[in-house]
């Protein structure tokens, strides 16, 4: 009886070991799958462009995010925001413009180039932008689109100033009063923000600072200094970011990766690697252990559709970090995230169609 029991225990141990080895091998095989890197070409541009092109002058449905001072504030979206009234909300309209600008900037022979310019030149006019400035100056709406929409507006400004063409120069001249206003709003707000906002949606401080820093490094030294100073104040001593808690059900940004992306732009490479290993221990060695693609259960639900955006924003952060650190595992994980949601964007649901092309394009541009 004793021999039988020992034999049973031995067999059970061997079977258990074999099962564990099988699981480990399966994980290893999954990790070794190589995903293709996205490219901006005529095909991908034509796919992405129509999302933004179709919505930047689509006025309804519309989410205004407005504070009413009295009954006279009740106006049509196109009256309140003559430049950026489409694509459901102000910030999506702004980054819809960014999407179209970057497609025609990077692909000079793009098939729909002239149609894009005609549409953009109707919205980014001097008169329209001055009305946008007036809205931001209203006593009841001074924090409008803080800081998410501000960040995307500076992305538009960055593109126009980087792009040395007659059309871009003219559009930037028209946009400049709003750009200056947003710069000043950043410089007024960040010194007063005692604690960073660490959520996976619009108010995320690291996202707002990261995009603004890209612009400021080229065109606004004063804003650059403020952002770098505040980034170190907020994030330099952070340790062990709980990335295993992510994602939240409505997230379109990764709080941990947005912070890691920002600090990549703030710290020298050697110092950054040390910071990253403290902030996200072992992440460089095995990023797929901590992140997998997020799945969307209902693309008609605007909040649940955020998770497609999360796949794209994770991808661009992983590209930024992985390319600088020459980390192929991060880049491959970025490719995996991108591929999953890119194939599902054209669902026919406006909940995602009004904004996801910008996130997808930004990831594509960061992949190279």
Q: Which stretches of residues belong to each language-model region?
A:
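Extended ligand-binding groove/face enriched in aromatic
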Residues: 86, 94, 101-220
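C-terminal motif of bacterial Sec signal peptides marking the signal peptidase cleavage site
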Residues: 14-16
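Bacterial lipoprotein signal-peptidase II cleavage site
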Residues: 18-25
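Well-ordered alpha-helical scaffold segments within catalytic/enzyme domains
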Residues: 30-40, 94-110, 151-167, 208-219, ...
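Fungal-biased detection of long, low-complexity, Ser/Thr-
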Residues: 292-368
């Amino acid at each position: 009886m004793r021999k039988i029991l020992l034999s049973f225990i031995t067999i059970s141990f061997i079977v258990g070991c074999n099962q564990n080895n099988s699981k480990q091998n399966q994980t290893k095989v999954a990790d070794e799958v190589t995903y293709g890197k996205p490219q901006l070409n005529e095909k991908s541009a034509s796919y992405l462009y129509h999302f933004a092109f179709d919505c930047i002058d689509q006025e309804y449905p519309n989410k205004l995010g407005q504070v009413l001072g009295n009954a006279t504030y009740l106006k049509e979206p196109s009256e309140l925001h003559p430049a950026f009234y489409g694509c459901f909300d102000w910030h999506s309209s702004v980054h819809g413009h960014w999407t179209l600008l970057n497609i025609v900037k990077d692909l000079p022979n793009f098939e729909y180039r002239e149609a894009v310019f005609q549409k953009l030149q109707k919205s980014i006019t001097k008169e329209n932008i001055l009305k946008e400035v007036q809205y931001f100056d209203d006593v009841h709406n001074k924090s409008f689109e803080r800081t998410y929409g501000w960040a995307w507006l500076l992305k538009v400004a960055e593109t126009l100033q980087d792009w040395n063409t007659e059309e871009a120069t003219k559009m930037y001249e028209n946009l400049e009063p709003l750009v200056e206003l947003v710069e000043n709003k950043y410089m007024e707000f960040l010194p007063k923000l005692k604690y960073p906002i660490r959520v996976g949606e619009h108010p995320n401080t690291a996202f707002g600072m990261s995009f603004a820093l890209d612009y400021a490094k080229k065109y606004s030294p004063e804003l650059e200094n403020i952002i770098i100073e505040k980034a170190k104040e907020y994030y330099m001593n952070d340790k062990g970011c709980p990335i295993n808690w992510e994602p939240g059900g409505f997230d379109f940004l990764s709080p941990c990766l947005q912070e890691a992306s920002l600090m990549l732009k703030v710290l020298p490479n050697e110092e950054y690697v040390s910071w990253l290993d403290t902030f996200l221990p072992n992440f460089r060695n095995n990023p797929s252990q901590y992140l997998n693609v997020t799945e969307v259960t209902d693309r008609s639900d605007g909040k649940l559709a955020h998770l497609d955006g999360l796949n794209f924003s994770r991808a661009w952060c992983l590209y930024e970090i992985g390319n600088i650190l020459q980390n192929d595992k991060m880049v491959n994980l970025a490719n995996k995230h991108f591929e999953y949601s890119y194939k599902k964007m054209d669902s026919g649901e406006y909940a995602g169609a009004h904004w996801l092309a910008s996130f997808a394009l930004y990831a594509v541009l960061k992949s190279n």
